Amino acid sequence: MAKMAKFSFFSSSSPKYHPSSPSSFTSFPASPLNQNFTQAMMEETVETADSVIRKWDPNTPSFTKIVSLFNHSRKEAKEFIRCVRDLRRAMHFLVSQDSQSPKLALAQTLMQIAMARLEKEFFQILSSNRDKLDPESVSGQSSISSNSEFEDVMGSDDDDESDNEMRKAGESITQVEKASAMVMSDLKAIAESMISCGYGKECVKIYKRVRKSIVDEGLSLLGIEIYKGSRFHRTDWVTLEHMIKNWIKAAKIGIATLFRGEKLLCDHVFSASNSTRESCFYEIANEAATNLFKFPEFVAKEKKSHERIFPLMDLQAAISDLWQDIEMIFHFDAVAGVKSQALTSLQKLKVSIHSALTDFESIIQKDTTKALTPGGGIHKLTRSTMNFISSLSKYSGVLSEILADHPLPRNTRLLESYVRAPISEDEQHNHALSVHFAWLILVLLCKLDTKAEHYKDVSLSYLFLANNLQIIIETVGSTPLRNLLGDDWLNKHEDKLCAYAGNYEIAAWSNVFMSLPEEPTDLSPEEAKIYFRRFHTAFEEAYMKQSSRVVPNAKLRDELKVSIAKKLVPEYREFYRKYLPMLGQERNIEILVRFKPDNLENYISDLFHGTPIHASSSFSSSSSSSSWKSLGCVSG
């Protein structure tokens, strides 16, 4: 509370805040007559202030000691503020014209009483109206500092005009906002009165103490703690992931609502003094906000692994999304450290994210798994790599910024030829990312080529490559990777897939294709029997071997079946139609001619499900006639 000791008006208890100079007030006439008249007016002002101010002396044993002036009567509160303003003007006059006047000593005493009352009112309003001054309510009134409805309500000389302004404001805002605006106006009026009278230090001290506790409490309720590096070294990654998710939610509320609301409130209450509001906001927010942005830096310093990249990118994206608010709220020099800490965290995160990308590439290159995928199916490295890359593609904004600063340290002309040239600013921004993704997939394809060599069967190698390239193409085509890599990339790799599929057909089925005569025109019965036996043997061998092959993708599976059937069935049908009648009198015809053309299609349709068929009654020369009938083969 303001002390009651006698003081010189110009020797403020707060050296930082000086009362306005006499020249800022109304000039007083210099003639003796006018001077005497003015002095009489000033002395009368002091006497008038005496009755108003002493009524609200916080140290007198009356009801006013326990009652809030601003809650009791807004009309009296306005009158009190005006009395303080007039008393200050009178003191300026008396100091300059009659420093020995007994009225000056009285005025000084009254000023001390008034400041004690305003100091008490300021604290009570701040403490008892936390609900009306919560950051969410304040931040909802983003333009309040420039809204005339809320300006100088307490300082208005015209009560009716002030009331009209409040009524006008009430038409466009909710009751909650109206109550909040009224409380803010009261605080502003008190702050301006105390600062103009040299009591800014006392006013600011109260404000800082109350509002800092609110900010600290708000962050604590959001789950923000005092962060220290040692805490992170002892925390497992699962717990840290949970902390990251909580921090992102808390930071969004903390910046967009808590700190923004505090900045708006501080700017409004201390709008008369830039230095005061900056100093206030620094004391209230700097420590808490700096601590808030230390969290991402500590996380970024932990062990770097590609598995941890996504939470790191979530942190990076969260800070980037908040950056406009950060710059707006912490724009002046006193709180520049907050922005500096946020920038440091961003840079540390970028380094960690890039390191995780490098780690991911290294894991692909160093994969030494030698176990062969049964049936030439999809390798787990392909699935895990493409799942990871497709997830990365959802963070194109974050990764584009990072990779723009870390271009691939190799000749990328070949890669860039696979990626569509950027035609817009956004595509230009993402071009480095597109090239990087193309590179990662190329690293995977090279590794798959190496793994394909481990198969002893060439046809199985090609089927393995086709299956794995198919899932790569499918993943690219159904995720944001498509926009990043472009249709040219897809077309080139689809052509490559067709080549793998074609090579598989040649390696797996060429013996069957070549088992029939190229020109089945004039064959003797003996020659026809040889070709039938050759075809059946080749088909049985190929079918039994290929029955264990697997093609998970339905589209590729059907395309392979159709392609094989088109090459095989028509030729066999023609051969069968022409030479079967020639062998009609042969004994054991069901053994010699074992397949009808229609049933070849049935056999082919059963392929690529990974169900192996071993030498059995189905393909045994000693099978009974009924067995072959059940398969749709020629009967005797």
Curated annotation (Swiss-Prot):
It is found in: Cytoplasmic vesicle, Phagosome; Cytoplasm; Nucleus; Endomembrane system. Pfam families: Exo70_C, Exo70_N. Mostly expressed in roots and, to a lower extent, in leaves, flower buds and siliques. Induction: Induced by elicitor peptides elf18 and flg22, by the fungus B.graminis hordei and by the bacterium P.syringae. GO terms for cellular component: cytosol; endomembrane system; exocyst; membrane; nucleus; phagocytic vesicle; vesicle. It comes from the Eukaryota. Transmembrane segments: none annotated. InterPro entries: Cullin_repeat-like_dom_sf, Exo70, Exo70_C. GO terms for biological process: defense response; exocytosis; positive regulation of defense response to bacterium; response to bacterium; response to fungus; response to molecule of bacterial origin. One of its GO terms (molecular function) is phosphatidylinositol-4,5-bisphosphate binding. Component of an exocyst subcomplex specifically involved in autophagy-related, Golgi-independent membrane traffic to the vacuole. Regulates autophagosome formation and autophagy-related Golgi-independent import into the vacuole. Involved in defense responses to pathogenic bacteria (e.g. P.syringae pv. maculicola). This is Exocyst complex component EXO70H1.
